[in-house]
């Protein structure tokens, strides 16, 4: 294999922001935010909106996140009423 063309592969902590579930895995993605893992080492943290801990397919039940959808956030940001408010 040619040297210098492949991204650097290292361990990172993936953090599900919905459930605060954390897991350590390998990735080419990196972050400036770090966290100490159970083994005492510091690893970069990648924040996730959804993971196997919070996705309904893997959990077998519906878990509704407290986060608003993109449209609701846009409407709230610009002070607009949503189409559901007219009913």
From Swiss-Prot:
Gene Ontology CC entries for this record: ribonucleoprotein complex; ribosome
Q: How does it assemble?
A: Part of the 50S ribosomal subunit.
Biological process (GO) annotations held by this record are: translation
Source organism of this protein record: Staphylococcus carnosus (strain TM300)
Any one Gene Ontology molecular-function term assigned to this protein's record:
structural constituent of ribosome
UniProt protein name = Large ribosomal subunit protein bL31B
| Keywords for the protein's UniProt record, in alphabetical order | Ribonucleoprotein, Ribosomal protein
Can you tell me which family this protein belongs to?
Belongs to the bacterial ribosomal protein bL31 family. Type B subfamily.
């Amino acid at each position: 294999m040619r040297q210098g063309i492949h991204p650097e592969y290292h361990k990172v902590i993936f953090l599900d922001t919905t459930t605060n579930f954390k897991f350590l895995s390998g990735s080419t993605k990196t972050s400036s935010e770090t966290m100490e893992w159970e083994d005492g080492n510091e690893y970069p943290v990648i924040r996730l909106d959804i993971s196997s801990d919070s996705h309904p397919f893997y959990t077998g039940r519906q878990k509704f996140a407290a986060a608003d959808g993109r449209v609701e956030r846009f409407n709230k940001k610009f002070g607009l009423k949503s189409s559901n408010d007219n009913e």
